């Protein structure tokens, strides 16, 4: 069968499989490609091709991730699957693979296990907005009551972490049966049902250009007779010439008007998400704007110093610390384009944090940064990355 060409007309959604080790995440990923390949919506990838995921480096952290793509009648999907638990933790915290929704795989034979809980918590902390459940290996459970009990347990666990446990679609099946070509309701039918649930339940994400304008400032210079120019890559939204923007972070928020947008030395009417631009700012002196601040749509983002974070601490092998750190640890936190010193408060009962750990913590910065939930950052000591984190909650 001829391969369909990549359809740009379909909405694109990023998903991934999460769940406890050996509950069948990779088998399910392979099964999805096999079943959809029959309709020309995927290229079949065997378990081994997915499991031998190449290692990538994201901000100096080694993560093994398999990237698979497939399409349903409605959408095009990019799907990530990680071989090991540590890879999931790193992936979700660094945002290396942003997920618009996740497929939580739970073995019906075992029920929810420690990593099931941990992945749900991580999904909540790092801002994975939707979860669909695949209850796997149901052919190994003869007792229907037991099956209902496992489903109830999964729903309660999701609710415990503020996901709508009662509304979340749970599809029952056997990924292995589907992979072996079984056409029955636990095999192929279950995969189609799962994809229908993913299509319907996980909304198409908002495009970057539809979000409020934000541009991290990378450089500032003055052009004689014209004023101050801030350069950087537009992270989201659109800025039009003549629009008011706020300069947020590091000092008191200032308002200004963008009187010109330049790209590749040409003047434009607007700058869009993904563009590297120079924005000419009215009435601001060169020293009033600096790297580390952001230009943003007025009122869309505010400066903060205190926040809760979910953090992964690099191992020695990844070039991280060789020793643990303790309460009151004061490294630099690298947000977007600059480092800010901050102090760490560990959760009660946690004495120290070892390289390779992931941990929730509270941080207080010495100067405010334009901040919102889900913002990623690096933890550095003298320019060397020793950790990666994500803002789970802004405190003040």
Swiss-Prot record:
Signal peptide: none annotated. Residues 174-176 are annotated as: G5. It catalyses: GTP + H2O = GDP + phosphate + H(+). Pfam families: GTP_EFTU, GTP_EFTU_D2, GTP_EFTU_D3. Residues 81-84 are annotated as: G3. It is found in: Cytoplasm. InterPro entries: EF-Tu_GTP-bd, EF-Tu_GTPase, EFTu-like_2, EFTU_2, G_TR_CS, P-loop_NTPase, Small_GTP-bd, T_Tr_GTP-bd_dom. CDD domains: EF_Tu, EFTU_II, EFTU_III. The keyword GTP-binding applies. Its EC number is 3.6.5.3. Residues 136-139 are annotated as: G4. The keyword Protein biosynthesis applies. GTP binds at residues 19-26, 81-85, 136-139. Mg(2+) binds at residue 26. Residues 60-64 are annotated as: G2. GO terms for molecular function: GTP binding; GTPase activity; translation elongation factor activity. Monomer. GTP hydrolase that promotes the GTP-dependent binding of aminoacyl-tRNA to the A-site of ribosomes during protein biosynthesis. This is Elongation factor Tu. It comes from Anaeromyxobacter dehalogenans (strain 2CP-C). The gene is tuf1.
């Amino acid at each position: 069968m001829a391969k369909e060409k990549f359809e740009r007309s379909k909405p694109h959604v990023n998903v991934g499989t999460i769940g406890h080790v050996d509950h069948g995440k990779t088998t399910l990923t392979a099964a999805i490609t096999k079943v959809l390949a029959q309709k020309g919506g995927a290229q079949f990838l065997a378990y081994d091709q997915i499991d031998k995921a190449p290692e990538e480096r994201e901000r100096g952290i080694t993560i093994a991730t398999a990237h698979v793509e497939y399409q349903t009648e409605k959408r095009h999907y990019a799907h990530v699957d990680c071989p090991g638990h540590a890879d999931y933790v790193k992936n979700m915290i660094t945002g290396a693979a942003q997920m618009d929704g996740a497929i939580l795989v739970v073995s019906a034979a075992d029920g929810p296990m420690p990593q099931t809980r941990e992945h749900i918590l991580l999904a909540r902390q790092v801002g994975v907005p939707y979860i669909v459940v695949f209850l796997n290996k149901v052919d190994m459970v003869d007792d229907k009551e037991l099956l209902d009990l496992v489903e109830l347990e999964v729903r309660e666990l999701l609710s415990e972490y503020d996901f709508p446990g009662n509304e979340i679609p749970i599809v029952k099946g056997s990924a292995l049966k589907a992979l072996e070509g079984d056409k029955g309701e636990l095999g192929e039918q279950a995969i189609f049902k799962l994809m229908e649930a993913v299509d319907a339940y996980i909304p198409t994400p908002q495009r970057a250009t539809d979000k409020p304008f934000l541009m991290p400032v990378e450089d500032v210079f003055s052009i004689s007779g014209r004023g101050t120019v801030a350069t950087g890559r537009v992270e989201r939204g659109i800025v039009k010439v003549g629009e008011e923007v706020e300069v947020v972070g590091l000092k008191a928020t200032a308002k200004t008007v963008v009187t010109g947008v330049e790209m590749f030395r040409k003047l434009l009417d607007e700058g869009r998400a993904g563009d590297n631009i120079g924005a000419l700012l009215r009435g601001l002196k060169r020293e009033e704007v600096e790297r580390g601040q952001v230009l943003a749509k007025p009122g869309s983002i505010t400066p903060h110093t205190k926040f809760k974070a979910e953090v992964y601490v690099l191992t020695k092998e990844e070039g991280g610390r060789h020793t643990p750190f303790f309460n009151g640890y004061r490294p630099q936190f690298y947000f977007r384009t600059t480092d800010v010193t901050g102090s760490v408060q560990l959760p009660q009962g946690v004495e120290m944090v070892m390289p390779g750990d992931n941990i929730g913590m509270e941080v207080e910065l010495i100067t405010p940064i334009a901040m919102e939930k889900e913002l990623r950052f690096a933890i550095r000591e003298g320019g060397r990355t020793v950790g990666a984190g994500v803002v789970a909650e802004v405190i003040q």
